[in-house]
Amino acid sequence: MPAHSLAMSSPALPAFLLCSTLLVIKMYVVAIITGQVRLRKKAFANPEDALRHGGPQYCRSDPDVERCLRAHRNDMETIYPFLFLGFVYSFLGPNPFVAWMHFLVFLLGRVVHTVAYLGKLRAPIRSVTYTLAQLPCASMALQILWEAARHL
């Protein structure tokens, strides 16, 4: 599909696609970081991986690996709903600037949240960025519900 077709189907769609793709890449980066931390700390989840990297004693948990896994799980709990909400919201005909702000606030909130989580930054940075990123999701969800209810 040519790029101009994306904009014609919904002026907000290109912004959504850009932010969504960046968020998916960010999730891949967290997964890669998790793997690197496992290797550095010699803390493997599977016995066969531990055997390959030194022996069965390395099939163990590690606080830093667990932190990475929690960050990744938190991404899944927030980014997957955003992908649905943002896609549907894009087709409601929102003001393109307002849509951009929804998508950008979520993206920046999630990036800072990940940096705060993995970097062990002091409270309340992580919880503030988590909440900030949830505001556009709540806004989009309410607008979707409103539009759906209007057409019942």
UniProtKB/Swiss-Prot annotation:
<keyword id="KW-0276">Fatty acid metabolism</keyword>
<feature type="binding site">
    <location>
        <position position="38"/>
    </location>
    <ligand>
        <name>glutathione</name>
    </ligand>
</feature>
<feature type="transmembrane region" description="Helical">
    <location>
        <begin position="124"/>
        <end position="152"/>
    </location>
</feature>
<dbReference type="GO" id="GO:0016020">
    <property type="term" value="C:membrane"/>
</dbReference>
<dbReference type="GO" id="GO:0001516">
    <property type="term" value="P:prostaglandin biosynthetic process"/>
</dbReference>
<keyword id="KW-0812">Transmembrane</keyword>
<dbReference type="GO" id="GO:0048471">
    <property type="term" value="C:perinuclear region of cytoplasm"/>
</dbReference>
<dbReference type="GO" id="GO:0050727">
    <property type="term" value="P:regulation of inflammatory response"/>
</dbReference>
<feature type="binding site">
    <location>
        <position position="113"/>
    </location>
    <ligand>
        <name>glutathione</name>
    </ligand>
</feature>
<feature type="transmembrane region" description="Helical">
    <location>
        <begin position="13"/>
        <end position="41"/>
    </location>
</feature>
<dbReference type="Pfam" id="PF01124">
    <property type="entry name" value="MAPEG"/>
</dbReference>
<comment type="function">
    <text>Terminal enzyme of the cyclooxygenase (COX)-2-mediated prostaglandin E2 (PGE2) biosynthetic pathway. Catalyzes the glutathione-dependent oxidoreduction of prostaglandin endoperoxide H2 (PGH2) to prostaglandin E2 (PGE2) in response to inflammatory stimuli. Plays a key role in inflammation response, fever and pain. Also catalyzes the oxidoreduction of endocannabinoids into prostaglandin glycerol esters and PGG2 into 15-hydroperoxy-PGE2.</text>
</comment>
<comment type="subunit">
    <text>Homotrimer.</text>
</comment>
<feature type="binding site">
    <location>
        <begin position="73"/>
        <end position="77"/>
    </location>
    <ligand>
        <name>glutathione</name>
    </ligand>
</feature>
<dbReference type="InterPro" id="IPR040162">
    <property type="entry name" value="MGST1-like"/>
</dbReference>
<keyword id="KW-0413">Isomerase</keyword>
<keyword id="KW-0560">Oxidoreductase</keyword>
<keyword id="KW-0643">Prostaglandin biosynthesis</keyword>
<protein>
    <recommendedName>
        <fullName>Prostaglandin E synthase</fullName>
        <ecNumber>5.3.99.3</ecNumber>
        <ecNumber>1.11.1.-</ecNumber>
        <ecNumber>2.5.1.18</ecNumber>
    </recommendedName>
</protein>
<comment type="similarity">
    <text>Belongs to the MAPEG family.</text>
</comment>
<dbReference type="GO" id="GO:0004364">
    <property type="term" value="F:glutathione transferase activity"/>
</dbReference>
<feature type="transmembrane region" description="Helical">
    <location>
        <begin position="96"/>
        <end position="119"/>
    </location>
</feature>
<feature type="topological domain" description="Cytoplasmic">
    <location>
        <begin position="120"/>
        <end position="123"/>
    </location>
</feature>
<feature type="transmembrane region" description="Helical">
    <location>
        <begin position="61"/>
        <end position="90"/>
    </location>
</feature>
<feature type="topological domain" description="Lumenal">
    <location>
        <begin position="91"/>
        <end position="95"/>
    </location>
</feature>
<feature type="binding site">
    <location>
        <begin position="126"/>
        <end position="130"/>
    </location>
    <ligand>
        <name>glutathione</name>
    </ligand>
</feature>
<dbReference type="InterPro" id="IPR023352">
    <property type="entry name" value="MAPEG-like_dom_sf"/>
</dbReference>
<keyword id="KW-0443">Lipid metabolism</keyword>
<feature type="site" description="Essential for protaglandin-E synthase activity">
    <location>
        <position position="49"/>
    </location>
</feature>
<keyword id="KW-0472">Membrane</keyword>
<dbReference type="GO" id="GO:0050220">
    <property type="term" value="F:prostaglandin-E synthase activity"/>
</dbReference>
<keyword id="KW-0808">Transferase</keyword>
<keyword id="KW-0275">Fatty acid biosynthesis</keyword>
<keyword id="KW-1133">Transmembrane helix</keyword>
<dbReference type="GO" id="GO:0004602">
    <property type="term" value="F:glutathione peroxidase activity"/>
</dbReference>
<dbReference type="GO" id="GO:0043295">
    <property type="term" value="F:glutathione binding"/>
</dbReference>
<feature type="topological domain" description="Cytoplasmic">
    <location>
        <begin position="42"/>
        <end position="60"/>
    </location>
</feature>
<dbReference type="InterPro" id="IPR001129">
    <property type="entry name" value="Membr-assoc_MAPEG"/>
</dbReference>
<comment type="pathway">
    <text>Lipid metabolism; prostaglandin biosynthesis.</text>
</comment>
<keyword id="KW-0444">Lipid biosynthesis</keyword>
<keyword id="KW-0963">Cytoplasm</keyword>
<keyword id="KW-0644">Prostaglandin metabolism</keyword>
